[in-house]
Amino acid sequence: MEENKKILMIIGMEKQLEQTICRAANIQPENALVLKSVFPDISQPYGDLMRDIITLVHRNRAEEIWIVRDKYEQMADEDISDLLNRDKDLNDRMQTLEYLFQNCSPEFTQSSIDEWLSPSENVAEGVQKSVAAIRRHPLIPLHVKVKGFLIENSILTDIETFFVLNTGILYTTADR
């Protein structure tokens, strides 16, 4: 790993994940910028998480962005929209938001509030979606490399390699 290369890592909420990644990739902790996120996918290309990513990349001159998630990360057992729908007051608000999702494109990139509230079906898919969203963002400098990884037993696997091995299909966007 290049001596002073800054890497922005967007990781899950698991304890010790940052240290495990730094050891596995031979990254000095002082060269790692870390953002923690509950879900593996970026649901809004112009939301708070993306704004934080853009700010950290520019402020710290990060040369790479890594989205790294534990391969066996526990996805939510219960759908958040189911929890919100149990409350009558929140249910009314959900219907209003659903109307906005249906009628206020392109502000909302998802087609429904349920799609916005729910993460991807699996961790690998969420990481791949995030990599694609960051690569396409016009405020991410073109020289910044964007990569996705799954970590299992302290071993990092590039997400594009993971998809080829598991599906035989390479889901990728422009090399960046």
Predicted regions: what they are:
Residues 1-5, 14, 40-45, 60, ...:
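Divalent-metal-activated hydrolytic enzyme cores
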Residues 1-50:
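Short, conserved "active-site rim" segments that organize catalytic pockets and cofactor/ligand binding
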Residues 10-12, 36, 67-70, 147-152:
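Short beta-strand segments
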Residues 21, 71, 97-101:
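Generic hydrophobic, helix-prone segments enriched in Leu/Val/Ile
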Residues 50-57:
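Short secondary-structure capping micro-motifs at structural edges
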Residues 58-78:
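Ordered, amphipathic secondary-structure segments that act as subunit-interaction surfaces
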